């Protein structure tokens, strides 16, 4: 079946459908990872986005339940150069096409993904849509132009859990950790659990005072989709957490929320960072880590002496982490849990545990 990718400037790419035969609109982004398409598709940070995978051949190793980063596909659509329908992997339980159809997600193959990626890199991430149809219709562009975009949209409330839950085991764990779910990835929870925390996950709008009354030793602010600026409830809760001096760790959107809570500003990036090869310098140690990233907004450095940058992106010098003088705080813009991506930064989970332990000892 034919499929059309339509951008908001009227550009049309014609290809072939290999997902569910439907239509979908969203922000068009690209990810440079060579593998990890299942983890990428199920990452809640991709809510309302259509993903272009720059690696030219996708689907080679199929789908396996262990690689899910949430309970379903979160992206609005998928764009690839060439889809492989015969995966070679003894663990594979279904094809990528079957996976997409199961969750009713459209996908298009056979288009020039290099041309599309260059367009995004030059012009920024456009709104667009995938339309499965036998022929093009002018209504496709009208539907794309009606998409409101992700700026000033609270997408965390779309992907957050509806009720609190315990992750992993609490038996024998020394510290209770409250995780705010703004779109948390499963591997983040796995690593928090594996590094000794008794993890309880809370809906995004849970008042921090309520969690404090229940009892916790520290807070974690998760990754998530879209613009942090409209998340007033998250910023207010974070400020109250910091007033009470709880140890605090934020990843990706969580890092941005902490930045806003400190009075900093965020900005929409031209095309963001999405892939598993972003070099980041640890300004404390001087070491360079290769990181996995997925974000389209960034914290602006306000050069406050008591809130220095802790990590710096070496490609475009954007802020990748911030500190607060005298406060037990750890933030990173990137994804230390990888899934997919390199494991250079997984030490941060143990570092946070040590920070909590040090804080509790006084």
Curated annotation (Swiss-Prot):
Pathway: Amino-acid biosynthesis; L-arginine biosynthesis; carbamoyl phosphate from bicarbonate: step 1/1; Pyrimidine metabolism; UMP biosynthesis via de novo pathway; (S)-dihydroorotate from bicarbonate: step 1/3. One of its GO terms (biological process) is 'de novo' pyrimidine nucleobase biosynthetic process. GO terms for cellular component: carbamoyl-phosphate synthase complex; cytoplasm. InterPro entries: Anth_synth/Amidotransfase, CarbamoylP_synth_ssu, CarbamoylP_synth_ssu_N, CarbP_synth_ssu_N_sf, Class_I_gatase-like, CPSase_GATase1, GATASE. Its EC number is 6.3.5.5. Residues 1-172 are annotated as: CPSase. It catalyses: hydrogencarbonate + L-glutamine + 2 ATP + H2O = carbamoyl phosphate + L-glutamate + 2 ADP + phosphate + 2 H(+). Pfam families: CPSase_sm_chain (PF00988), GATase (PF00117). Residues 176-362 form the Glutamine amidotransferase type-1 domain. Belongs to the CarA family. Composed of two chains; the small (or glutamine) chain promotes the hydrolysis of glutamine to ammonia, which is used by the large (or ammonia) chain to synthesize carbamoyl phosphate. Tetramer of heterodimers (alpha,beta)4. This is Carbamoyl phosphate synthase small chain. The lineage of its organism: Bacteria, Pseudomonadati, Spirochaetota, Spirochaetia, Leptospirales. The gene is carA.
